């Protein structure tokens, strides 16, 4: 599994300093600067402290079973083209070295609904999907809230949370501009 994050810090240097500070108790395998430079901080086979509490596809302890990639971005602006190019190249390499399918490339928000929002609404998931580097959207039969919860769980959203948090989290990835009550379009997950 690969978990994509944004740093939510002023710049890459500040993020790198924090990610390498043992007292901060946070780390990731990689940091990709907005220039496209890739910095490896933890070996891929080693555990990093990037995911925290959460679950994806029925699996917990995400830190022990994933590679964390931090993107130098505050979460409020578009991701640089050079950064996305570098991310695509890095993901291709990781997916060649490890048994990570496109369905295993997720955002921090996907596995920690309500607790995390990264990589955020500005992240271009469709770009990764077109390259086969993230799972394409699946269409589920529209229905009521119970049907939606079942569909979301089938898509991987198994972390415990209330309905509104689940809806917000799935929209963050598939339709961050959508608001209001559950609708048929929300069943594209």
Predicted regions and their residues:
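Active-site-adjacent loop/helix surface patches within enzyme catalytic domains
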Residues: 1-103
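Basic/polar, cationic surfaces and motifs that engage anionic cell-wall
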Residues: 75-189
């Amino acid at each position: 599994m690969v978990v994509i994050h944004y740093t939510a810090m002023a710049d890459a240097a500040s993020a790198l300093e924090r990610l390498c500070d043992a007292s901060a108790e946070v780390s990731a395998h990689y940091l990709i600067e907005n220039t496209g430079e890739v910095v490896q901080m933890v070996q891929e086979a080693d555990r990093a402290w990037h995911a925290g509490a959460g679950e994806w596809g029925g699996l917990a302890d995400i830190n022990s079973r994933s590679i964390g990639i931090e993107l130098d971005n505050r979460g409020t602006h578009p991701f640089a083209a050079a950064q996305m190019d570098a991310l695509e190249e890095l993901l291709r390499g990781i997916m060649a070295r490890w048994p990570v399918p496109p369905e295993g490339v997720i955002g921090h928000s996907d596995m920690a609904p309500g607790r995390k929002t990264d990589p955020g609404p500005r992240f271009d998931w469709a770009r990764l999907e077109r390259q086969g580097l993230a799972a394409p959207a699946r269409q589920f039969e529209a229905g009521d809230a119970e049907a939606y919860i079942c569909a979301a769980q089938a898509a991987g959203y198994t972390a415990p949370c209330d309905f509104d948090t689940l809806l917000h989290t799935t929209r963050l990835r598939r339709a961050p501009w959508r608001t209001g009550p559950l609708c048929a379009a929300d069943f594209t997950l």
